[in-house]
Curated annotation (Swiss-Prot):
This is Activin receptor type-1. Changing residue 328 to R: In FOP; variant phenotype. Its EC number is 2.7.11.30. Residues 21-123 are extracellular. InterPro entries: Activin_recp, GS_dom, Kinase-like_dom_sf, Prot_kinase_dom, Protein_kinase_ATP_BS, Ser/Thr_kinase_AS, Snake_toxin-like_sf, TGFB_receptor. It catalyses: L-threonyl-[receptor-protein] + ATP = O-phospho-L-threonyl-[receptor-protein] + ADP + H(+); L-seryl-[receptor-protein] + ATP = O-phospho-L-seryl-[receptor-protein] + ADP + H(+).
Length: 509
């Protein structure tokens, strides 16, 4: 860019016509000529002596005024004689004794040009041409500089290309005829994270074909994609939610999160499509969709209800617990647990998704990793201590207790769809009867903290032993005092006990 700025004045200097040596310097010991002198400046004289003679015509108050005379100073003659004729004045100059005697200056007429005019127009044309040329050259230099800047910016957005090398060659290789299960099983022994090695992740990402959009939200879109004939889910984050993509990618690539009730991670990548950078998170695909969508269309029997809630509790317990050893993991709190962030699998179990707000804690270092994400959880599922801002943000157990509150609300959503004695409630979100569809922070704070309301328990639940047990369990998740709430492990054990008692009842029958 600096080179382009330095070149511009040089080009203009080259393009401008350079004056001759005769114009630059006055003559040494100039020769004087006798000239005819007519007009007011001559007085009583009819001749004068000077370096140049002239004859002029000007218009003054509508009258033509003719004058003749001489220039005694070289520079004065140079300035005047070089001036092109105008509609109001014309000057003709010459050198030689009495040379202006027979010269009569004429004003320019339409269609007639004078040598001075031609030179003037030529000079102006050359100046304009040189400026246009310089501007075009500068525009070209700017274009090249912008292209380089864009390329450099793209490289910055893809830091793994620099660290691990580009993968263009890998795409043409046979990753090969391996299935995703083969790749993921192999990756368990090759690192501490849940995902594939970075290069394989990027290879898989570049080979995915997007087939259909299966969901849209505030933070992006979810697509069904295909990789070597297998369905995968591709979550495309919006640019404003880059922090969530980065957090989830970081967590999956550094923590061993492989569990049947946690959404299976495959790969993560930054890719450029339609001249914009897209943030991809590639996971297992579950065609039955989210628990939120599933419950609106499906009623549950006792077995399927318990299978769903027990699988969610198992996934949450796995997140909350810290596992030590080479295949270990830190304790993790989800912070945005809700029915929309839980997916239903073909076997009737569920898996927890969306770890963009997750918090990690390691007991050995006592380090709390909250991440750097300005996004907050879903207001409808916020615990009282979050709504009244009394949560201890430097205590990891506080975040786990927030998850338990949200789990109790999900448990209530599921239990409403369980049929007992031929009766079942329509699906409704928590607090549907006391807050609007998109409640504000203040709406939820008043209902949960000030009025201390909880979701309504229908009377018909108390005629069914399973629903009665679930009602008791969810109430223990909704204590106003966070430390009084159950732990995820305690909930899992209680649900397992309820499930076992149901199996025993079937056996006895």
């Amino acid at each position: 860019m600096v080179d382009g700025v330095m070149i511009l004045p040089v080009l203009i200097m080259i393009a401008l016509p350079s004056p001759s040596m005769e114009d630059e310097k006055p003559k040494v010991n100039p020769k004087l000529y006798m000239c005819v002198c007519e007009g007011l400046s001559c007085g009583n004289e009819d001749h004068c002596e000077g370096q140049q003679c002239f004859s002029s015509l000007s218009i003054n108050d509508g009258f033509h005024v003719y004058q003749k005379g001489c220039f005694q100073v070289y520079e004065q003659g140079k300035m005047t004689c070089k001036t092109p004729p105008s509609p109001g004045q014309a000057v003709e100059c010459c050198q030689g004794d009495w040379c202006n005697r027979n010269i009569t200056a004429q004003l320019p007429t339409k269609g007639k040009s004078f040598p001075g005019t031609q030179n003037f127009h030529l000079e102006v044309g050359l100046i304009i041409l040189s400026v246009v040329f310089a501007v075009c050259l500068l525009a070209c230099l700017l274009g090249v500089a912008l292209r380089k800047f864009k390329r450099r910016n793209q490289e910055r957005l893809n830091p793994r290309d620099v660290e691990y090398g580009t993968i263009e060659g890998l795409i043409t290789t046979n990753v090969g005829d391996s299935t995703l299960a083969d790749l993921l099983d192999h990756s368990c022994t090759s690192g501490s994270g849940s995902g594939l090695p970075f290069l394989v992740q990027r290879t898989v990402a570049r080979q995915i074909t997007l087939l259909e959009c299966v969901g849209k939200g505030r933070y992006g879109e979810v697509w069904r994609g295909s990789w070597q004939g297998e369905n995968v889910a591709v979550k495309i984050f919006s640019s404003r939610d880059e922090k969530s993509w980065f957090r989830e990618t970081e967590l999956y690539n550094t923590v061993m999160l492989r569990h049947e009730n946690i959404l299976g991670f495959i790969a993560s990548d930054m890719t450029s499509r339609h001249s914009s950078t897209q943030l991809w998170l590639i996971t297992h695909y579950h065609e039955m969709g989210s628990l939120y969508d599933y419950l609106q269309l499906t009623t549950l029997d006792t077995v399927s209800c318990l299978r769903i809630v027990l699988s969610i509790a198992s996934g949450l317990a796995h997140l909350h617990i810290e596992i030590f050893g080479t295949q270990g993991k830190p304790a993790i709190a989800h912070r945005d647990l809700k029915s929309k962030n839980i997916l239903v699998k073909k076997n009737g179990q569920c898996c927890i998704a969306d770890l963009g707000l997750a918090v990690m804690h390691s007991q050995s270092t006592n380090q709390l990793d909250v991440g750097n994400n300005p996004r907050v959880g879903t207001k409808r599922y916020m615990a009282p201590e979050v709504l009244d801002e009394t949560i201890q943000v430097d205590c990891f157990d506080s975040y786990k207790r927030v998850d338990i509150w949200a789990f109790g609300l999900v448990l209530w959503e599921v239990a409403r769809r369980m049929v007992s004695n031929g009766i079942v409630e329509d699906y409704k979100p928590p607090f549907y009867d006391v807050v609007p569809n998109d409640p504000s922070f203040e709406d939820m704070r008043k209902v949960v903290c000030v009025d201390q309301q909880r979701p309504n328990i229908p009377n018909r639940w108390f005629s069914d032993p399973t629903l009665t047990s679930l009602a008791k369990l969810m109430k223990e998740c909704w204590y106003q005092n966070p430390s009084a709430r159950l732990t995820a492990l305690r909930i899992k054990k209680t649900l397992t006990k309820i499930d076992n008692s149901l199996d025993k009842l079937k056996t006895d029958c």
